[in-house]
C-alpha cells in the first residue's frame, strides 16, 4: 500500500498533469459549517460572508486592509535579550521561539506601523495571536512602548488591536513588568493630548486586559470576541457559582457598559477614522454614498441653528 501511495500515485499524477490541491484552499465557517474559498475569505478580511463570523486574521493582513491602499511603513521593533531565565517546560523556550519565528517569519507577536486611514496619519499596533498566543513578553512590551514613543514624537494618534492570552509565563516577572511599563507609555501619550483607541479582538485576556487593552480613550470590540481576565472555568471554580452564558463576549460587555462599541471588522476603518476626526477636531469627509438627510432632519437642524 505504501508503494502504491508513495510511488505509483505521484507517477500517475505527474503523467496526467494533475496538481495537488492545497490544504487551505477552502476554509470551514465554524458557526454555519459553510465552506468558503480562501481567496474570497481573505478579500473579506476573514469575515464569513453569510454568518458574519470573525475568524482570526494575521497582523500583516489586518494592517493591509486597515491602512489607505494597503500602504504602511512598519516600525522596527527593539532588540531584547532572548530567554533570560533559560526557561524549559516540555520544550526549551529558545527552541519554541525559533520554531514560531521560522514558521511565521516574524520576531515576535507585535507589528506596529505608520500610515493613514482616510487621510489621517496614525500609528497602528497589532498583536498577532498566532505567535505564542499573543502573549506579552519583553519583546512585545518594548515594541508597544516604541509605538507609543513614535506616536508622541510624530504627533499621531495610536490605534491598538489586542489579541492575547496574557503574560508570557516563560519570562516570569520580566513579562509582568511590561504591564506597568506600557501603562506609563499610555499616560505619556495622554499627556501629549493624543487619542488612544483600543480594538479588542478575540481573545483578549489575562495581563493584557489588566493593562493597556483597557486603558484607551475609546474601546471598540469585534463581534463575538472573548474579553476578560481569567477564563470562565477558572472563575466558576473559584467562586463556585454558575455564570451567565456568554458573560465574556463583546456583546455582553457592551450591554453592561464595559466597552463603548461593537463594530464589524469590515466597518472598523471608517468608524475609527470618524472617531479620530471628532477627537482631534478635524473636518468631516463628505461621502457621496451616504444618504442625504430627510426634510424633517434638515428642518430640525435649521430650527436648532436658529
From Swiss-Prot:
Pfam families: Carboxyl_trans (PF01039)
Enzyme nomenclature, EC number: 2.1.3.15
Name of the protein described by the UniProt record: Acetyl-coenzyme A carboxylase carboxyl transferase subunit beta
GO biological-process terms attached to the record: fatty acid biosynthetic process; malonyl-CoA biosynthetic process
Main location: cytoplasm
InterPro entries assigned to the protein according to its UniProt record, in alphabetical order: AcCoA_carboxyl_beta, Acetyl_CoA_COase_Trfase_b_su, ClpP/crotonase-like_dom_sf, COA_CT_N
Span list, region Disordered: 286-306
Presence of keyword Glycoprotein: no
HAMAP family: AcetylCoA_CT_beta
GO terms, molecular function: acetyl-CoA carboxylase activity; ATP binding; carboxyl- or carbamoyltransferase activity
Catalytic activity: N(6)-carboxybiotinyl-L-lysyl-[protein] + acetyl-CoA = N(6)-biotinyl-L-lysyl-[protein] + malonyl-CoA
The protein's role, per its UniProt record: Component of the acetyl coenzyme A carboxylase (ACC) complex. Biotin carboxylase (BC) catalyzes the carboxylation of biotin on its carrier protein (BCCP) and then the CO(2) group is transferred by the transcarboxylase to acetyl-CoA to form malonyl-CoA.
Keyword line: ATP-binding, Cytoplasm, Fatty acid biosynthesis, Fatty acid metabolism, Lipid biosynthesis, Lipid metabolism, Nucleotide-binding, Transferase
Amino acid at each position: 500500500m505504501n508503494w502504491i501511495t508513495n510511488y505509483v500515485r505521484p507517477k500517475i499524477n505527474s503523467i496526467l498533469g494533475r496538481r495537488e490541491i492545497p490544504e487551505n484552499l477552502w476554509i470551514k465557517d465554524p458557526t454555519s459549517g459553510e465552506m468558503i474559498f480562501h481567496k474570497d475569505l481573505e478579500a473579506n478580511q476573514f469575515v464569513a460572508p453569510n454568518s458574519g463570523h470573525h475568524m482570526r486574521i494575521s497582523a500583516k493582513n489586518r494592517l493591509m486592509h486597515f491602512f489607505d491602499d494597503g500602504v504602511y511603513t512598519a516600525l522596527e521593533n527593539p532588540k531584547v535579550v532572548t530567554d533570560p531565565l533559560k526557561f524549559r517546560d516540555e520544550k526549551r523556550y529558545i527552541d519554541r521561539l525559533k520554531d514560531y519565528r521560522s514558521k511565521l517569519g516574524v520576531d515576535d507577536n507585535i507589528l506596529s506601523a505608520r500610515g493613514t486611514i482616510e487621510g489621517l496619519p496614525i500609528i497602528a499596533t497589532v498583536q498577532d495571536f498566532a505567535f505564542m498566543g499573543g502573549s506579552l513578553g519583553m519583546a512585545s512590551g518594548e515594541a508597544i512602548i516604541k509605538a507609543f514613543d513614535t506616536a508622541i514624537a510624530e504627533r499621531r494618534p495610536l490605534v491598538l488591536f489586542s489579541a492575547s492570552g496574557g503574560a508570557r509565563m516563560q519570562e516570569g516577572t520580566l513579562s509582568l513588568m511590561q504591564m506597568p511599563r506600557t501603562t506609563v507609555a499610555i499616560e505619556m501619550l495622554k499627556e501629549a493630548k493624543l487619542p488612544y483607541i483600543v480594538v479588542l479582538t478575540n481573545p483578549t485576556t489575562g495581563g493584557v486586559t489588566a493593562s493597556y487593552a483597557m486603558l484607551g480613550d475609546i474601546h471598540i470590540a469585534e463581534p463575538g470576541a472573548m474579553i476578560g481576565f481569567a477564563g470562565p472555568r477558572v472563575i466558576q471554580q473559584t467562586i463556585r457559582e454558575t455564570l451567565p452564558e456568554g458573560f465574556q463576549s463583546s456583546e455582553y460587555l457592551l450591554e453592561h457598559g464595559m466597552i463603548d462599541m461593537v463594530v464589524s471588522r469590515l466597518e472598523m476603518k471608517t468608524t475609527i477614522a470618524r472617531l479620530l476626526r471628532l477627537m482631534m477636531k478635524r473636518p468631516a469627509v463628505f461621502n457621496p454614498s451616504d444618504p442625504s438627510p430627510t426634510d424633517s432632519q434638515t428642518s430640525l437642524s435649521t430650527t436648532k441653528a436658529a
